[in-house]
Amino acid sequence: MLMHSILIILVIILTTYFTRIWPFMVFNAKNPPNDFVRYLGRALSCSVIGMLVIYCFKDIHILKPPYGINEITAFLSVILLHRIFKVFVLSITLPTILYMVLVQSHALEKAFFNP
Protein backbone atom coordinates (compact mmCIF):
# COMPACT_ATOMS: atom_id res chain seq x y z
CA MET A 1 0.00 0.00 0.00
CA LEU A 2 2.81 2.42 0.87
CA MET A 3 4.62 1.67 -2.39
CA HIS A 4 1.41 2.27 -4.33
CA SER A 5 0.97 5.67 -2.68
CA ILE A 6 4.58 6.59 -3.39
CA LEU A 7 4.16 5.64 -7.05
CA ILE A 8 1.00 7.73 -7.34
CA ILE A 9 2.75 10.74 -5.81
CA LEU A 10 5.74 10.24 -8.12
CA VAL A 11 3.49 10.13 -11.20
CA ILE A 12 1.72 13.30 -10.05
CA ILE A 13 5.05 15.07 -9.49
CA LEU A 14 6.41 14.06 -12.89
CA THR A 15 3.20 14.98 -14.70
CA THR A 16 3.05 18.37 -13.01
CA TYR A 17 6.72 19.01 -13.72
CA PHE A 18 6.33 18.04 -17.39
CA THR A 19 3.30 20.27 -17.91
CA ARG A 20 5.16 23.20 -16.34
CA ILE A 21 8.41 22.72 -18.29
CA TRP A 22 6.82 21.79 -21.65
CA PRO A 23 6.19 25.38 -22.88
CA PHE A 24 9.81 26.29 -22.18
CA MET A 25 11.03 23.29 -24.16
CA VAL A 26 8.71 24.03 -27.09
CA PHE A 27 9.11 27.82 -27.20
CA ASN A 28 12.71 28.91 -26.89
CA ALA A 29 15.07 31.36 -28.59
CA LYS A 30 15.32 29.14 -31.68
CA ASN A 31 11.58 28.56 -31.89
CA PRO A 32 9.69 31.64 -30.57
CA PRO A 33 5.91 31.45 -30.13
CA ASN A 34 3.77 32.51 -33.08
CA ASP A 35 1.32 35.42 -32.98
CA PHE A 36 -1.64 33.24 -31.97
CA VAL A 37 0.19 31.85 -28.93
CA ARG A 38 1.22 35.38 -27.93
CA TYR A 39 -2.41 36.49 -28.29
CA LEU A 40 -3.52 33.62 -26.04
CA GLY A 41 -0.95 34.70 -23.45
CA ARG A 42 -2.52 38.17 -23.37
CA ALA A 43 -6.18 37.13 -23.61
CA LEU A 44 -6.26 34.18 -21.23
CA SER A 45 -5.48 36.28 -18.16
CA CYS A 46 -8.76 38.15 -18.64
CA SER A 47 -10.54 34.89 -19.41
CA VAL A 48 -9.32 33.31 -16.19
CA ILE A 49 -10.64 36.24 -14.17
CA GLY A 50 -13.99 35.97 -15.97
CA MET A 51 -14.17 32.24 -15.33
CA LEU A 52 -13.41 32.71 -11.63
CA VAL A 53 -16.11 35.40 -11.35
CA ILE A 54 -18.70 33.11 -12.94
CA TYR A 55 -17.65 30.23 -10.67
CA CYS A 56 -17.84 32.53 -7.68
CA PHE A 57 -21.38 33.75 -8.39
CA LYS A 58 -22.93 30.51 -9.66
CA ASP A 59 -24.50 29.39 -6.36
CA ILE A 60 -25.58 32.72 -4.88
CA HIS A 61 -29.10 32.96 -3.48
CA ILE A 62 -29.79 36.67 -3.25
CA LEU A 63 -33.02 36.25 -1.29
CA LYS A 64 -31.66 34.22 1.63
CA PRO A 65 -28.77 34.76 4.03
CA PRO A 66 -25.85 35.27 3.64
CA TYR A 67 -27.00 36.99 0.41
CA GLY A 68 -23.71 36.31 -1.37
CA ILE A 69 -21.63 38.43 1.00
CA ASN A 70 -18.56 36.16 0.64
CA GLU A 71 -18.74 36.26 -3.14
CA ILE A 72 -19.32 40.01 -3.31
CA THR A 73 -16.39 40.62 -0.95
CA ALA A 74 -14.07 38.49 -3.10
CA PHE A 75 -15.35 40.15 -6.29
CA LEU A 76 -14.74 43.63 -4.90
CA SER A 77 -11.24 42.57 -3.86
CA VAL A 78 -10.54 41.52 -7.47
CA ILE A 79 -11.61 44.94 -8.72
CA LEU A 80 -9.68 46.80 -6.02
CA LEU A 81 -6.45 44.84 -6.42
CA HIS A 82 -6.50 45.04 -10.19
CA ARG A 83 -7.22 48.77 -10.21
CA ILE A 84 -4.39 49.42 -7.77
CA PHE A 85 -1.66 47.01 -8.94
CA LYS A 86 -2.70 45.92 -12.48
CA VAL A 87 -0.99 42.55 -11.97
CA PHE A 88 -3.14 39.66 -13.20
CA VAL A 89 -1.49 37.03 -11.02
CA LEU A 90 -2.10 39.11 -7.91
CA SER A 91 -5.65 39.95 -9.02
CA ILE A 92 -6.43 36.26 -9.48
CA THR A 93 -4.54 34.64 -6.62
CA LEU A 94 -5.31 36.79 -3.58
CA PRO A 95 -9.08 37.11 -4.14
CA THR A 96 -9.29 33.37 -4.83
CA ILE A 97 -7.58 32.67 -1.52
CA LEU A 98 -9.81 35.23 0.20
CA TYR A 99 -12.93 33.64 -1.30
CA MET A 100 -11.91 30.14 -0.22
CA VAL A 101 -11.13 31.30 3.32
CA LEU A 102 -14.43 33.19 3.59
CA VAL A 103 -16.51 30.33 2.22
CA GLN A 104 -14.88 27.65 4.35
CA SER A 105 -14.64 29.65 7.59
CA HIS A 106 -18.05 31.35 7.29
CA ALA A 107 -16.40 34.37 8.94
CA LEU A 108 -18.63 37.03 7.37
CA GLU A 109 -21.77 34.96 7.92
CA LYS A 110 -20.91 34.59 11.60
CA ALA A 111 -20.11 38.29 11.89
CA PHE A 112 -23.23 39.63 10.17
CA PHE A 113 -25.98 37.01 10.27
CA ASN A 114 -25.71 35.00 13.50
CA PRO A 115 -27.92 36.24 16.34
Curated annotation (Swiss-Prot):
Gene Ontology annotations for the cellular component aspect, listed alphabetically: plasma membrane
InterPro entries per UniProt: Brnchd-chn_aa_trnsp_AzlD (IPR008407)
Any matching Pfam family: AzlD
Domain of life: Bacteria
Disulphide bond pairs: none
Subcellular location: Cell membrane
Organism (species): Helicobacter pylori (strain ATCC 700392 / 26695) (Campylobacter pylori)
Residue intervals passing through the bilayer: 6-26, 43-63, 84-104
Protein name as it appears in the record: Uncharacterized protein HP_1330
Coiled coil: none
UniProt keyword Membrane present: yes
Family: Belongs to the AzlD/HI_1737/HP1330 family.
Keywords for this protein: Cell membrane, Membrane, Transmembrane, Transmembrane helix, Transport
